[in-house]
Amino acid sequence: MPTTTIDIHPHIISGDATRYPLAPLGGHQSDWSRTRPVTLEQLVAAMDTAGVQKAAIVQASTCYGHDNSYLADAVSAYSKRFTGVFSVDVLAPGAPERMHHWRVKGLTGMRLFTFGSTMSEQADWLDDPKSYPAWACASELGLSICLQMSAKAIPQVIRMAERFPKVRIILDHCARPELADGPPYSAAASLFALARYSNVYLKLTPRIFAESRRGKATPETFFPRLVSEFGASRLAWGSNYPSSEGSLPQLLDIARQSLACLPNADRDWIFVKTARTLYPVLAD
């Protein structure tokens, strides 16, 4: 196993709602951010316990919406250990200006939240032409874009991957594929169809590890297939802590167990090297 581990999907929630007021997307705070919040300091302690050296902290969209202030302050406080993945309204005319604002504050990725948690239906704006200036700005700034979405939005991802080939697109939870049918995983055909787009990356989170054990699926048949289609250099681990239940050491252990079927070289990409590709600042 790699001696260094990088997490590209933890979240943080401040205990100071006055300094960092709630502004959740859709107007409804997620249950996890209310019942098991983790502050910056608690994340640092959890990472130390788990042996996770660095992280790309993802904006808690269902708590703070597009106000990335707490995230920016966290990255500023630990600039050698963290980068941040911010959120803006990409359909708004001033989106590129907001993106520049957060980039200057040390945030090197952007998140688009279109499905999940408090949003039960897949949004239809992912490939809206009004978002093109924001995507062009991401290309200019070298920002990776991670997408919280369902597999229903894969056709939209294809259109954006083709239109903006220089933007690294990361699919949270591997776009939530259905794996219970088992090999050859025909129900996940739309996911595998994305392999031909070299700018599309997959984030391996607790959700996909659980899905890989559902029905006829097994980690030993699914993850080698994923590597054979995409290559390990386009796969990266994200804990989804604390949104996913369990301690950070437990979530990392689940990931390691699930990926034990892969060669060491592949796991080195998934736990370290791909993260450095997506967020080069974490390689410093």
Model segments located where?
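Mid-to-C-terminal alpha-helical segments outside catalytic/metal-binding sites
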Residues: 3-6, 19, 23-54, 202, ...
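Conserved, mostly hydrophobic/aromatic
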Residues: 9, 47, 71, 102, ...
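A generic "structured core" feature
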Residues: 5-6, 10-13, 48, 129, ...
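Active-site gating/metal-coordination segments in enzymes
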Residues: 53, 62-152, 158-159, 201-208
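Short, acidic/polar
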Residues: 36-46, 92-102, 186-187
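Histidine-centered divalent metal-coordination motifs
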Residues: 9-15, 148, 173
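Catalytic pocket-lining loop regions of alpha/beta-barrel enzymes
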Residues: 124-237
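Active-site neighborhood of phospho(di)ester-bond hydrolases with catalytic His/Asp-centered motifs
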Residues: 5-8, 58, 85-86, 111, ...
